[in-house]
């Protein structure tokens, strides 16, 4: 029974977080979401812990975690933004590889889970598809790259561009159903894609990529890549989370990802964390 109660509280709290960020433009005097934290804490069985917050072209963006107030269990972690971001498709920013925002997660998330910070890249013109794609223009649609990194931003700045041949990722470290990653992109790393995406003739809608360090030693980001059209459709959806057999360290790792909409806000939610060794 507790599982279902927590699930209901989690869903309600996510909606509450969404409502806050969707209203932030009119409530810039409350950037930390104290009202929402109190609402979730006192009335709905979950506690909201806020990470960092910024404003990009009028769109408020915040990171957060939802935890069980009784035992501190991390129920979900994510980022929420108002949909002005998708409507405007900002030009590249001054973050790594042109990121328009780079926000750390709360300490409790950084200390215990795979997630350390998020970087958001806006691609109004799209970009090339991975080598071997049957549709080389698949990713040449307006979209966002949401990089959920397991390492600090200062280490992302140090990642070099490197062309193949590069070391293969060991089988136990490569998620099942994913391709070997390609070249290393400067200030980002190497991208591995679901094998099905290379044979998909249709334009990009949404896909979950896995990122690897240049030497292929370990996975260091999860990347939901989502088109502008999908975001503006305001329809909730889920993506499978890549699950390697080995990670190289012990931590909590998310097994579920969903995108949830509420009014003029969108939330990218990782949940159902499991302990990996």
Model-predicted segments: where are they?
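Bacterial Sec-dependent N-terminal signal peptides
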Residues: 3, 7-33
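Metal-centered catalytic cores of metalloenzymes
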Residues: 26-277
